[in-house]
Structure formats: C-alpha cells, structure tokens
C-alpha cells in the first residue's frame, strides 16, 4: 500500500472518521483507523462497533493498492502538526506504516486490516434525500430534550419518524418533550426508529452546511447517512418510544403570546434566584400580564412582570426554569405561544408563526 496526498485533503476526513472513536477503546483495534487504497481512492474508516464513519479521498498521484490499520489519534496529530500545503507520502513496509513529508519521517505500528470489525451487511427499508439544512433544523430543534444515561435506554436517543411527505424528530427525557416535523417532498412509508444519542451527535457533526444533499437509508437495525465523500452508519436503539401524541395537551384553552427574547431574558433573570437544585419558578397569568417569581432557601426573591397577550381565567403554575429556557433558546423566533390548561397540566410552547415544532414541559409542584 502506497499513496501521496496533500495535507489539506486528509485533515477533514481524518477528523470526521475519528469522531466515533471513544476515549478508551475496549479493543486495541478500535483505536485504529482502517486505511484502504483501491481504484484511485483512499478510504478511511473509524468505528466503535455501534457506529462507523467512512471518508473517501480521491488520489491523483501514483499509488499502490492495499490496506492496513493505524493508531487514529497519532496519525491525525502527525498530519495536523505538519505545515500547511505539505505533501504526505504514506507507505506500508512490513508491520510498519511510514509517513514522510519534507524532512519529517514517522514510523507507525499497524494492526492487520483483516482484523478490523465491519458492521454487518443490512438491507435498507426506507430511503430518502433531503437538504442538509432540513436535517440540521430537525436535530437542533429537538436534541436538547434527549435523556442522558436514563435507565429507560430508549429515551437516550431521538425518534426519527417518516409519515406521508414529512420527516419528524422527537426527543423526551420524561420531564419535557420536543417534536419537529419538516416536509421533504417525497412520499414516504410510515416508519419510525430510535437513533442513539451518540449517533445523533455524530450525524450533526457531519453536516457541513454545504449544498450537498443528504441521503438517508433506514433498515431494521441501522441508519445510514451519505453526504459528499462521507458515509455514516449507526446501529439503532431497540425499544418502544413513548407515543408523543398522547403527551401533547388535549385541548389547552388558555393561550398566552409574548416576545421570545423578552420571555427568555425574564426567565434567565428570575432563574438566578431560583433553588439551585430544583430550579423552580412560579408563573402568575392574568389579563395581558405575566408575573414570574422565584425564590431560594436563602429567602432571596426575584419578580418579573411582563406585558403579554392573554385573555382567559387567571391561573398560576410552576416550572423548572431550565426546561423553559431550553425551549426558548431552541425556538429562535419572534413571538412564542404558550398553551395552558390548568396548574397541574403540561404546557405546550411553540413559535406563534409556525407549527413545525412543538414543545411540552411538565409542571412542577412548588
């Protein structure tokens, strides 16, 4: 195996394929990258057995086919440490891989390519293409609601659901729920899968904001995304995701509208004097007015009064202020609508001008 490539052509692919690798691999070979040269292309693969990332780099200079695996971190650090515009010549000699550039020379240990674990072959059941920006929006709108190391393992991820011409993402940790739907202009079978938290983060990392469309394939146990020269595959979480439709408030009759930034700033200020552990704030809603109060064990108090659009019965309700702020930060809109029922029912929050995303936050007893 032998190839020569410019440093700039190798850095981004190396960075992307090193993404899935954990800090301390369970098997030594999982800390390595698989390098394969064939048909004028260098393929780089990194895996942690749950997901894999493959990058392809076109080789324009003379090369010889072959394959090996090398320590990912060291190879990346060497390439990154070389000067801009450097040419990197790589050659396999016995059990060592030689890396040369200018007057620098490195000899890396290798492990046989045949020992590198590949994800099993699988058949895709649903396939579609969408703009990167659409996928980015779907993930950004909901990922903050994913659970983190919950014993209900199926909550440590994101539900991807196809229905009609829409792709939907849903995330919940049992206290709050986020759902976002976007039309993708293709008629799709009804199908839903749970992508693990780490897979969602890697999928987000591979979106570079370019014009290259994203091609998605979903199988019974795997999801794969292709964009440009990168292919990302992740195993799915096996479990039943809660039905988000049953979580949305049935018929909330009290609607409050207010400026998103105004609300965000008021909640952020009130949060300063909320209980550090429970983060509770109390909302008092009356005719065109919202009062937010918070206090803590030191008996310090915060009060914010805002002009809002509201006509309905007066009520009070408590929330974890962190959950409300997460929603307001994700909304990025001008005005928000809060749909309330009573003091013991969840609130639904959405962009007043769009219904593509909805957020549900459970109340707190204060």
UniProtKB/Swiss-Prot annotation:
Residues 129-243 are annotated as: 2. GO terms for biological process: bacterial-type DNA replication; DNA damage response; DNA strand elongation involved in DNA replication; DNA-templated DNA replication; error-prone translesion synthesis; negative regulation of DNA-templated DNA replication initiation; regulation of DNA-templated DNA replication initiation. Pfam families: DNA_pol3_beta, DNA_pol3_beta_2, DNA_pol3_beta_3. Belongs to the beta sliding clamp family. Small molecules can bind to the hydrophobic cleft and inhibit binding of various protein factors, suggesting this may make and attractive antibiotic target. Residues 245-365 are annotated as: 3. NCBIfam families: dnan (TIGR00663). Keywords: Cytoplasm, DNA replication, DNA-binding, DNA-directed DNA polymerase, Nucleotidyltransferase, Transferase. The temperature- and UV-sensitive allele dnaN159 does not grow at temperatures higher than 37 degrees Celsius. The global SOS response is chronically induced. The UV-sensitivity of dnaN159 is dependent upon Pol IV (dinB), it has an enhanced Pol V-dependent mutation rate (umuC, umuD), and is absolutely dependent on the polymerase activity of Pol I (polA) for viability. Confers DNA tethering and processivity to DNA polymerases and other proteins. Acts as a clamp, forming a ring around DNA (a reaction catalyzed by the clamp-loading complex) which diffuses in an ATP-independent manner freely and bidirectionally along dsDNA. DNA bound in the ring is bent 22 degrees, in solution primed DNA is bound more tightly than dsDNA, suggesting the clamp binds both ss- and dsDNA. In a complex of DNA with this protein, alpha, epsilon and tau subunits however the DNA is only slightly bent. Required for DnaA inactivation. The RIDA complex (regulatory inactivation of DnaA), composed of ATP-DnaA, Hda and the DNA-loaded beta sliding clamp (this protein) rapidly hydrolyzes ATP-DnaA to ADP-DnaA in a DNA-dependent fashion, preventing reinitiation of DNA replication. DnaA inactivation is stimulated by DNA synthesis. Its main location: cytoplasm. GO terms for cellular component: cytosol; DNA polymerase III complex; Hda-beta clamp complex; replication inhibiting complex; replisome. This is Beta sliding clamp. Residues 1-120 are annotated as: 1. GO terms for molecular function: 3'-5' exonuclease activity; DNA binding; DNA-directed DNA polymerase activity; identical protein binding; protein homodimerization activity. It is found in: Cytoplasm. Induction: Part of the dnaA-dnaN-recF-gyrB operon, but also transcribed from at least 3 promoters within the upstream dnaA gene, induced at 42 degrees Celsius. Induced 1.5-fold by hydroxyurea. A shorter isoform, beta* is induced by UV treatment and also at low levels in late logarithmic/early stationary phase growth (at protein level). Beta* transcription induced by naldixic acid. Forms a ring-shaped head-to-tail homodimer around DNA, which can be opened by the delta subunit. Binds interacting factors in a hydrophobic surface cleft between domains 2 and 3, each monomer is able to bind different proteins simultaneously. The beta* isoform probably forms homotrimers which probably load onto DNA. The DNA polymerase III holoenzyme complex contains at least 10 different subunits organized into 3 functionally essential subassemblies: the Pol III core, the beta sliding clamp processivity factor and the clamp-loading complex. The gene is dnaN. InterPro entries: DNA_clamp_sf, DNA_polIII_beta, DNA_polIII_beta_C, DNA_polIII_beta_cen, DNA_polIII_beta_N. DNA binds at residues 24, 73, 149, 153-154.
